[in-house]
Every structure is written in C-alpha cells, then in structure tokens.
Amino acid sequence: MQSLQHKASEWSGVPSDEAFAIDDTNRFLKLGLQTFINLSTNFYNRVYDDDEEWFRSIFADSEKQNAIQNQYEFFVQRMGGPPLFSQRRGHPALIGRHRPFPVTHEAAERWLHHMQQALDSTPDIDDDSKIKMQNFFRHTAYFLVAGNELKKQNEQMPCKHAAGSDNS
C-alpha cells in the first residue's frame, strides 16, 4: 500500500520535498500574523460566497469567523509561529479534523482555486512565499483526499473481530 504522502505527491503533482520547502524559511517571521489573518479572511470570504452550492454546503455548519481563526492559527503554527492552534484546539490532526467532510478530488480543486485567489489578493505575500505556500497547500489538500479515501476503504473492510465471527 502506498503511503498517504506518496499518494499526495502523485495526485497533487507536488513532490514531498517541494511541499515541505515551506519549512526552509520561517514564514511567520517573514510575513507576520496580520498577513495570515488577511489570507484566511480573503479565502473564507470567497468560500462562503462560492457559486457552487455543493462546495458552500461543506462549510454550512461552520461559522465563518471560527473557520477564519482556525485556519490562520493553523497556518501560523505550521509556518513557524507560536502554537496558537494547538493551544486552543489541541493537536491539528488534519485527517481526523476533516473526517466529517467530503474531501474529494473535486473539493480539493475547488478549495485550491479559492486559496490561489486568496494568495493572489493578499499583497503582503512575496512571490517566493506564495509559490512555497501553493505547493504546500496543494500537497496537503491531496494528503487529505488520500486520507479520506483510505478511511472509505477501511469502512468497507469487514473487521476480523466483528461480532459473530468464527475465531476457532
């Protein structure tokens, strides 16, 4: 079985080393807290105004301000800043936190579309950071898709310890 990282690289077209080049520079120190807040605000304004009802419905049970805060706190923490997300919400556990949502190839592409627009409309993000962030986001989106597909496969497999199974 291929690892989730391998699947993410295959499906996203972004090799792991390019995805994790995000760590070459402390993006939090380079960009600052307000830039991450602006990026997440730009992103979720687009998501909540999306023309596609199926995509908006993924976020229907989340308050926009909470979604913005969760995202920018995760980005800050992941990109070299203080552990804001973990202090408030615990371990990021991306696959587990996204488990209730339909994380499909189509949803990943729609998410990435909005993130690209948000990156392009956040002027304080330099070109090098933008490219590295795009690669990280693309790889991570498909990491979540791979995790979702693995979850579906596991749900379809009967448990060998299921009630009524013959263990003799």
Curated annotation (Swiss-Prot):
This is Group 2 truncated hemoglobin 3-2. GO terms for biological process: nodulation. Belongs to the truncated hemoglobin family. Group II subfamily. Induction: Repressed by cytokinins (CK, an equimolar mixture of kinetin and 6-benzyl-aminopurine) in roots. It comes from the Eukaryota. The keyword Metal-binding applies. Keywords: Heme, Iron, Metal-binding, Nodulation, Oxygen transport, Transport. InterPro entries: GlbO/GLB3-like, Globin-like_sf, Globin/Proto, Hemoglobin_trunc. Heme b binds at residue 98. The lineage of its organism: Eukaryota, Viridiplantae, Streptophyta, Embryophyta, Tracheophyta.
